Amino acid sequence: LATSIIYKSTLLYELVMVALYGRHYASRYRAIADLIPARASVVDLCCGPALLFSRHLRGKNVRYTGLDVNAGFVEGLIRAGGAGQVCDLRKDEPLPPADYVMMQASLYHFLPDALPIVGRMIAAARRQVIIAEPVRNLTTSGSPLLAKLGRVLTNPGMGEQSHRFTEESLDELLSVYGSQVEKSFLIAGGREKVYVINAVG
């Protein structure tokens, strides 16, 4: 399956993300970094070019492992001093354990049934799961051209993704965790919603 051009280069990836998020681009990473204490261990699912690590977590001595289907991104992460693994997270396999298991802007890849991957994250987390997911998306635009552009630009090599979350559908999905949810809040000018879910036990 053809990979979107933005997943072929960290520079292109970042240019598109800056265009999408504008002045909120940097703050979306800071919001997640602020949830992770120094010297914690982190597993980041669908980590992309791992900018969260290189710009925010490396300086906090966080033990970071990024998982992604894109070998180029994983190689770049390893060169930057993190640990990385190339893997297809759609396979039903246990995730590496860590204090914090997180995913930013990638849960939609697992639609129409995203609960199993969240369950695997909960099973791997010693402290908390952090999920940040876009709830305002190009693919839900009323313009067919913009919607198509959103699907094409967000294919990491697993096929075009037509399904996306709204705030309501994300809330509904994660409501099954009830009192395990420590908090939820919007970031990036309301474009993404963050859920912090406590580990079991």
What is the meaning of each model-derived region?
Residues 132-176, 182-185:
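C-terminal alpha-helical "lid/dimerization" subdomain adjacent to the S-adenosyl-L-methionine
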Residues 40-48:
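Conserved class I S-adenosyl-L-methionine
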Residues 49-91:
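Class I SAM-dependent methyltransferase SAM/SAH-binding core
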Residues 106:
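Hydrophobic adenine-recognition pocket in adenosine-nucleotide-binding enzymes
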